[in-house]
């Protein structure tokens, strides 16, 4: 589901077919600035982790499902930034946990990055809340990667009381887990949404926001398709790994005059974007039903595949910078060696979407 192997990445140069539909400009709502959070599955978990750590003064919590160890694919880091490798992503981060660095190494890097001003001060992480999940049958991302990520949060001040960690307690494959929608629970296959009689959406939102009203049995709100290209450098979404169109779920209560709502960002994994699955992910992972009855807007940014033809100026190294499975950028593809930081292309794009929704300037 994530980038399977480095050789697979080098061997795939064609993007999946299809184009995004026309979409409107993303609007603004009355958002409680203290109630903005993020979650994700697989590559989306790594990106959720990157967003949370880069902007911990704003994101009050994160949900990490089957992924999420900050800087896991980094080979070296210095005062100029990082040098990541896809081979570390597919090796240590996914299948060879013995090659992972100690949690103290990742935590110290985060402190150094904060000292450089590339991410928010780490003190914000100590005031956060965290949901983490790894399935017992996950054969894509080794559970130790998720455990190591949780350990890093602890070293940076996250209290145990603010953590909900399902550590191989459920026989789930590599997937976002639902009560009844998707393939059988232990499977490691598309669409990577598994029916496990476990309401992961509820657990994520309850961990981050506390007690919830009962989920809606029928959605009251609407889905909004919005233009993501304006958030991409130069308006060119494809070379950045961004799909042209993102999606937003707006509960009816959030469109009532004077109503204040919360905002939760949900990030799909590889092979789960609208480019690949249409509306399957953003309609069927169960988040909207809980959001609807609890005044939570849900932002679903969309990644896309990147192939050599998407780069405007051909270079011999383009083949090393592609993204054949539509993953979020957690190993520095598309020449983005700043992908971990506030000025990383995708981190910045999603951050600007959040700022727009909250009615703030960048």
Describe each region flagged by the PLM.
Residues 26, 75-78, 83-93, 180-182, ...:
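Cap/lid segment of the alpha/beta-hydrolase catalytic domain
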Residues 30-83, 116, 213, 361-362:
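Primarily recognizes the serine-hydrolase "nucleophile elbow" in alpha/beta-hydrolase
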Residues 72-156, 161, 204, 250, ...:
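The feature captures the conserved acid-bearing segment of alpha/beta-hydrolase catalytic domains
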Residues 259-271:
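Short beta-strand element of the alpha/beta-hydrolase
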Residues 278-296:
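Short amphipathic alpha-helix adjacent to the substrate-entry channel of hydrolases
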